[in-house]
Amino acid sequence: MKRISLIALVTLMSGCTMLEPIETPEVVNATTVVDAVEGDKSKDESSGIVDTLRGRSDPVAGDPAWAPIHPKQQPEHYAAETGSLFSVNHLSNLYDDSKPRGVGDIITVTLDEKTNASKSANADLSKSNDSSMDPLEVGGQELKIDGKYNFSYNLTNSNNFTGDASAKQSNSISGYITVEVIEVLANGNLVIRGEKWLTLNTGDEYIRLSGTIRPDDISFDNTIASNRVSNARIQYSGTGTQQDMQEPGFLARFFNVSL
């Protein structure tokens, strides 16, 4: 009887392990939250051993976090036939300008960024001590110990330290990029975002820009300078063989960290 019970228990346990896991709707329909300005904050999945050794994941064109915004078409209000040429649905202000004001509007940003930083520090420290004592005399005669050593000393000590450090850094970028308005804030400011990809011989180059602007800073030709963009985040880099050659290899990074 015990043997039959044991066989039944083993069979039941083996059957449970062979059952396939049931995927719940939460797992099947799970999505990641994408920030409108900074991009996808979810952990990037490695595409293979090459990306693992390189220690970085290259951006790709068509990233949903940088996708353009397409505003929904608003339905037109029904208007009765009045026989008049005036239509409320197609009303436009005679004195209105063409500055972007809504989600999906396009604006050109003029990139003109120049930063220069330099720092230097100099230190020169010195210290010296000089102390001496003449031999002691008693009755016009030097006082000596054992007839050989007198009571006198001469001490000299000096310390010198010199340090010099300097650091310089400069960056410059110029060009144009056309972005879109992705959000209109309550105070009227516009949140913009956009990217531009250039495919060259053995790699791609891209420019990404995001930030917040004021409609008053937009010029008459629908452009705005990059130094007028608040919380600006500008990325200019590339992918491909040339970009990989600018970085040290896996072994070089390993020895640099370990040593």
From Swiss-Prot:
GO biological process: bacterial-type flagellum-dependent cell motility
Signal sequence region: 1-15
Pfam families noted in UniProt: FlgH
Lipidation (N-palmitoyl cysteine): 16
Alphabetical keyword list: Bacterial flagellum, Cell outer membrane, Lipoprotein, Membrane, Palmitate, Signal
Bilayer topology term: Lipid-anchor
Gene Ontology cellular component annotations, sorted alphabetically: bacterial-type flagellum basal body, distal rod, L ring; cell outer membrane
Lipidation (S-diacylglycerol cysteine): 16
Record function comment: Assembles around the rod to form the L-ring and probably protects the motor/basal body from shearing forces during rotation.
UniProt-listed HAMAP family: FlgH
Descriptive protein name: Flagellar L-ring protein
Source organism (scientific name): Vibrio vulnificus (strain YJ016)
Gene responsible for this protein: flgH
